[in-house]
Design a protein with these regions (language model features):
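Short, amphipathic C-terminal "tail helix"
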Residues: 124-141
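Unchanged
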Residues: 1, 32-123
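Short alpha-helical scaffold segments that flank and stabilize functional sites
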Residues: 7, 46-47, 136
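Residue-level signal for alpha-helical context at structural boundaries
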Residues: 28, 62, 129-133
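N-terminal strand-loop-strand
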Residues: 1-29
Length: 141
């Protein structure tokens, strides 16, 4: 899972896609599987380009972190990326056959309101998106 932040503008790149287990559209950060022979950084760069069309550079990558250790062995790497909007020339996406993804550029200070609107629309919001908003000072009042 990556946290792509733009420059200029300090906006988050967020996607919305249908997630069958939830039965609804879900807002989330771009993410994807690591292919055989790939490391987490390479996978993050590839997935961001495939899902959003944006190219980014990796600022940091965590080791494995477990998403729900009480229920499963699933893990992710959290990858923070910078996307230079002025350097983007080819925003073509390359979705998997089952994917239909919309991309949103959201100012970080507007994220709590963005999440509230998403929920009012009946959409789901991924935990990691909420956590980013909380750690940036949202939802604390």
């Amino acid at each position: 899972m990556m946290i792509p932040v733009t420059k200029p503008g300090d906006k988050l790149i967020i996607i919305r896609q249908f997630r069958p287990p939830t039965g609804r559209l879900v807002y989330e950060f771009p993410a994807g599987l690591i292919n055989p022979g790939e490391d987490p950084v390479e996978a993050a760069v590839r997935e961001l380009k495939e899902e959003t069309g944006y190219a980014g550079t990796v600022d940091f990558c965590t080791p494995r972190v477990f998403t729900s250790p009480g229920l499963s062995s699933e893990f992710v790497h959290l990858v923070r990326m910078t996307v230079d909007l002025d350097a983007q020339t080819d925003l073509q996406t390359h979705f998997d056959e089952s994917e239909s993804i919309e991309t949103f550029l959201v100012p970080q200070d507007s994220l709590p309101d963005f999440i509230r609107r998403a929920e009012a629309e009946g959409c789901g919001v991924d935990t990691k998106l909420y956590m980013w908003a909380i750690t940036r000072g949202g939802f604390l009042d």
